[in-house]
């Protein structure tokens, strides 16, 4: 079985994708879309997502933050995003 290409997404990557008014939103969204279409697997951590959600709460609407959370969780359940749990 062929291994999927993986890229680690940090806070700023997720923020650029989720924050539509951000300077890099279009560029980050295009990269993410092309990466997914090519069969790539985004990898991130629970700590990264916590930081991203905290920043989104201060920069976007509650609905925008909720949409991001729901999207990430759905992608994780569908094996389209891998979330690593950080332990010490």
Where is each model-derived feature located?
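Short glycine-enriched loop/turn motifs at secondary-structure junctions
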Residues: 35-37, 75-78
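Short, well-structured N-terminal submotif of metal-dependent ribonuclease cores
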Residues: 1-44, 57-70
